Amino acid sequence: FRFETTVVLPGETTLLRQYGRTLAPCIRLTPTYAEAYRRLMLEAYSAHPEAFTSSVAEREALPLSWWQQRLTTDPSAHEVIFGAISQGVLVGAVGLGQETREKARHKATLFGMFVQADHQHAGLGHLLVEAALEHAHTRPGLRQVLLTVTEGNTRAHALYTRCGFETFGVEPDAVKVGASFVSKIHMWRRLDGGVARATA
C-alpha cells in the first residue's frame, strides 16, 4: 500500500529531514490513512508486545471505523497522530493525547511510538517526537507531556532523554506479557516558553 501524495492539514507543521536519498515528511495523519495506520500498529503490537498495554488481538478485533475515528481532524479531538512517510509509505507513528478531565487538561501523554525496523537508526523517532512536541505547544493550557517506556529499553529511553524528557518514577510489573511482567519508566517534559522543540 503506497500513498501518491502527502496530506498536510492547514496550520499543521510539516517537518522534513534528509533520509537517505529521499525526504521523510512527518505529518498529522487523517482518516484516509486508517488502513495503513492499523497495519503499522498491528505490526508494532506483534513485534514488541512488552512495549504496549494493548495486545495485537484486542486491536485486531476493532473495526476500521475505530482507527478512522482515532485519526479524526475534528478541532475538538483530544488525540492527534503523526506519521513518518518514506517514499510514499507509512513507516512510523506516534500519538499525543490530551487529558479531558478539568483538573488534568494541562497534561498530555505521548503514546503509540513505533518505527519499522528497516527505517530505524535514521532519526525518524526523533522527528516524530519533535512533531508531537510542536503540536503540544499549540494546545491552550497544555503545560507538560508524559510518557512511559519499557524498563530496559535503553535506546528509547535515550531518545526521550535527548528530547528533553526526565524520569520521575518506575511502575513495577506494569504490563503482563505471557507469564512475565515488565516494568515501565515514567518520564515527563514541561512545555516552557517558546517553541517546544526536541533538543539536538
Where do the PLM segments sit?
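Aromatic (phenylalanine/tyrosine) cluster motif
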Residues: 1-3, 19
